[in-house]
Amino acid sequence: AVCILHHLKSVALLPSALSRCLSGSSFNIPPSAEFVARPSGICSMMKLPVQTSTEGLDAAFIGIPLDIGTSNRPGARFGPRHIRAESAMLRRYNPSTGAAPFDSLLVADVGDVNVNLYNLPDSCQRIRGHYAEIVASGCVPLTLGGDHTITYPILQAVAKKHGPVGLVHVDAHTDTSAAALGEPIYHGTPFRRCVDEGLLDCRRVVQIGLRGSSYAPDAYQYSREQGFRVVLAEECWLKSLVPLMEEVREQMGDKPIYISFDIDGLDPAYAPGTGTPEIAGLTPTQALEIIRGCKGLNIVGCDLVEVAPVYDVSGNTALLGANLLFEMLCVLPKVKTL
């Protein structure tokens, strides 16, 4: 400890290594601002170590800076970078729930998938291959998007190991379109493609926060026909979602599930930095209730998508995204509660 403290001012010392040494922990720990200035160091998720492989990790943060699947406002390619920057405010423990993820899991930031910004099918292939290796290693991926197209190749990799998975999907939109401008892959089709390929256990899919105008009288017909549970935003207004999540936990059982959280599920008053905003959405409090309500489920992966920082000069949308990813980490199966 004396040696470490002697080198506190050295830029060569990794902040997370400092925290690990000072605490005597064998896990990676987000550094305390008592010892390391928040604006300093490499911009990684929660200032965790950056490594190129998930070998030995229990969970990892991965960025996918892709937005060529967007249909309205672009900019989600910058989501991972801004989420990481805002995550410097996050700390080691979650006092509200007692979760101690960094006393339970070995976690690191493994950088970004090298996507092809000029070819969406090629990007999907790259994502699928990258995640196949991550999932095969036994590591749970927590993904920083990127537009919602990315969930399709991620679930291809996840289902290859776990079989059809349950899904907790928070979004303003169903993302079950058949195609757009003749293209079957974009951010409005990921879950249609997942159904087509048998990647989802449709009896264990719930979509929460859906709203907005539509091109058809019943915008949710396809989802209901597949057996998805559809929870409209109007059903969530002015109420706690704790009772809903009790029902969701019963529905999901103990089989593998995936959490996909589109930031536009939240009302744009809280999260304006997104590409396809819809009014009258969920609140940050309800977002916490949804994620915390997944505690005890067999979560095999998570993503937080559609943060487009250019539309939010305050940085609050990216800050929300960073906090929600931390909350997802806190409900992973092996996380201890103090």
Show where each model-derived region lies:
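Aromatic-lined glycan-binding groove of carbohydrate-active enzymes
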Residues: R204, S213-S214, A219, G253-Y258
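Catalytic cores of soluble, metal-dependent hydrolases
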Residues: V2-L66, N72-L142, T149-T151, A157-H162, ...
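Active-site environment of divalent metal-dependent phosphoester hydrolases
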Residues: D175-S177, S213-Y215, P309-Y311
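Glycine-rich phosphate/diphosphate-binding loop of Rossmann-like nucleotide-binding domains
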Residues: E197-L199, R211-S223
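Short, structured patches in soluble enzyme cores that scaffold and shape functional sites
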Residues: H169-A172, Q207-G212, L232-E234, E306
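Active-site histidine-anchored catalytic micro-motif
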Residues: Q125-R126, A136-R204, I208
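Short, surface-exposed alpha-helical segments at coil->helix boundaries
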Residues: R77, G188, A216-Y220
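Short helix/loop capping segments that flank catalytic or ligand/cofactor-binding pockets
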Residues: T70-N72, A178, A216
